Amino acid sequence: MAWQQLHLQCEKDNVDLAEALLLEAGALSIALDDAGDQPLFEPLPGESPLWDEVILTGLFDATTEAGTSHVIEQFSHEIAAQVQASRTWVSAVDDKDWEREWMSNYKPIECANDLWIVPNWLTPPNPEATNIIMDPGLAFGTGYHATTRLCLDWLTEQDLKDKVVIDYGCGSGILGIAALLLGARHVYAVDIDPQAVLATNQNAARNSVDNRLQAFLPEDFTIFCQQQDIPAVEVMVANILAKPLIGLAPYFATLMASKSRIVLAGLIESQTEQVTEAYQPYFALDPKHAFTAQEDQHWQRLSGTFTG
C-alpha cells in the first residue's frame, strides 16, 4: 500500500487544532517531533509537555481520494492558514508497520488516581497500581493523546462498580478496558474501523477482561441490540470527533438507563457549543462541562447525566 505524509510546522499552542484538522482531513495517524533541538525533561504525572516549535506528520492512505497528492496539497494550505504553520511539505513513504516503527517512543503513563497505561513490552513501574497493558496496534488510543487522558481521568472519578458501559469509538479499547479494571461489570465497545475491533479484543485479552468485553462494528452492534435483550447502559464514553458526536446524540439517548452518565471527548474549544446544543435535550450537562487539560489547551471534555 502507498502512503503520503503531510508535514506541518507550528507553535505548540496550535498543535491541538492542527491534530484535529488533520484527523478530520483523513489522517490515519499523527506523529509529533521537535522542530529544533529543545530538550524535554521528566514531566510530572499526567503531563505531556511539548516543544515550543513542533512538526506534525499526518499519514494518509495514497489509494484513497484524501491521500492523493493534489488533495493533500489543497487542504494543506487551508490547515496551514488556520494553525499559522511556518512551513508545510508533502512526502511519499513506503509501507511500514508504523506502530512498531514508533514503539521506542512509548513509555508508561501515570494517569489520575494511580491508573497507569503500560505498553505490553515494558514492565509496569508500579505493579500494585491499576495497570492497563496495551499494544495499540493500528488503532487510536495509546493514552498519550489528551482526549484519551481526559476520558481516563473522568472514569477514575465515577462509581463504575457493576455498571454496564459503552465505549463508542473504542480505538485500541483503552477506555473500555480501564472501565472494567475500575469495577465495571460489562463493556460493549464499538468502532467503525475493523482494525480497532481486533485491537480492542486483543488488548482485552492482555488484561484478562475479554470475558466481560464485546467489540463490534456499528452495524453489527445494531443487529446485536435488536437480537439480544441487553441491559440499559449506565455509563457511556465517546471519544470521537465533534461532527459524529452531534449526529449520534439521539441514538445514544436510546441506549441509556435513567440517570446514566456520559462523557464526550475529541472536541476542540470552538466545537463545544454545537455539541452542547445537540446533547442538552437528552442530558443535564455538568456545570463545569468544558474541561481543558492544562497542557492541551484546545481539547475539551463534556459530561452529563441522562434525563430520560
From Swiss-Prot:
EC number(s) recorded for this UniProt protein: 2.1.1.-
GO biological process, one term: methylation
Protein name per UniProt: Ribosomal protein L11 methyltransferase
The species this protein was found in: Psychrobacter arcticus (strain DSM 17307 / VKM B-2377 / 273-4)
PANTHER family referenced in this protein's UniProt entry, alphabetically: ELECTRON TRANSFER FLAVOPROTEIN BETA SUBUNIT LYSINE METHYLTRANSFERASE (PTHR43648:SF1)
Family: Belongs to the methyltransferase superfamily. PrmA family.
High-level lineage: Bacteria, Pseudomonadati, Pseudomonadota, Gammaproteobacteria, Moraxellales
Location of this chain's protein in the cell: Cytoplasm
Catalytic activity: L-lysyl-[protein] + 3 S-adenosyl-L-methionine = N(6),N(6),N(6)-trimethyl-L-lysyl-[protein] + 3 S-adenosyl-L-homocysteine + 3 H(+)
Main location: cytoplasm
Gene3D superfamilies: Vaccinia Virus protein VP39
